[in-house]
Amino acid sequence: QMTVASDTQYEVTFRDVPVAATERVGTARGGWAVWSDVMHEGIILLAAQAMGGAERALEITVDFSKTRQQFDKPLGAFQALAHYMADAVTNVDGGRTLVHEAAWAAASGRPIAKLAPMAKLFACKTYRDVTAMAQQVHGGIGFTTEYDIQLFFRRAKQLQLSFWDDRYLEELVAAAVLDERRAARA
């Protein structure tokens, strides 16, 4: 059992469980293809969740930076913090577009072997980066359990670890890109 950000994960092991032929998913030795297809659709949903979290964490941070005063002016008036938030909103908007494209491709029956892992990689990295920046802008209160930003930060890490990790997603994207290159040369 592993718990990160209040999302408990369990492992279930089946041994010698009879399954009728009519109840089986896929063909004998063909389960990985079915599993992979389902996982690709699932990681698009996780990417959407990550982008929603990044967007909300950014909204909370922007509001905080407008109201929190330091040296008689709002935190958002400081150039360095404004640049952090500008970078964050750029990445959030770009990530949202990538996730929308992946979802559209999946819904349209188009190939998602590259788009789905790209969407999850980018969305989870964006979520993690936005929440790390948000904690910096919030200062000490951003790490306390009484304030929601810490939950967004923990959830970002949990989503990054869920389903396939960054390394495997990078391998999927690389394989898809290399396959495209080979097909273009043929």
Placement of each model-derived feature along the sequence:
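FAD-binding core of flavoproteins
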Residues: 1-59, 63, 73, 167, ...
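Residue-level signature of the cytosolic catalytic core of signaling kinases
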Residues: 27-28, 77, 108, 145, ...
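C-terminal helix-coil-helix/basic helical segment that borders enzyme active sites and/or dimer interfaces
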Residues: 62, 66-73, 89-122, 135-138, ...
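A glycine-biased, small/acidic residue-tolerant capping/turn segment at secondary-structure junctions
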Residues: 104, 127-153
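Glycine-rich phosphate/cofactor-binding loops in nucleotide/flavin-utilizing enzymes
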Residues: 141-186
